[in-house]
Amino acid sequence: MGKTQNGTPIHTITIFANPFLTNKPSLEDIGVYKVSPGEDPPSEGPWHTLYFLPGIHDIGVGFPVHSNKTYFIPGDAIVYGTMNNNKDDDDGNHILIYGHGTLSGDRLPHPNFADPPIPEDEHWKYHSITIQGVKRDNITNTYVFNNLEY
């Protein structure tokens, strides 16, 4: 239930239109590692795709991602935590994190307000993601900020 500007309750529905995924990995493919809710996903191994199965996952802070690996989050999966390559410039190429699911830092404390305090040299693990080399190819990938399209 939402509220109008004047505080009167209203019923709302939000619909997000996303294109069908044409490159969704198959659970039967060799090299696809299936991560069940509650399981600690492996950060390395002979797999090429880490597939988070439906449900709620908690990967913690700074789950390591690696070059030439794919991380798939389907629409019925929520992954709490952060992903990074531990500042290794040689291990940060051709990483694909995709799907219609949710990758959220909601369960993590803000590093400036955590109790006990998070050491300053660990704050980088909590920073927002930096994406380079993204191709925008349809309206669902369009960013709108202050009524300006990017």
Task: Enumerate the predicted regions with their spans.
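Extracellular/periplasmic carbohydrate-active domains that bind, remodel
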Residues: 1-150
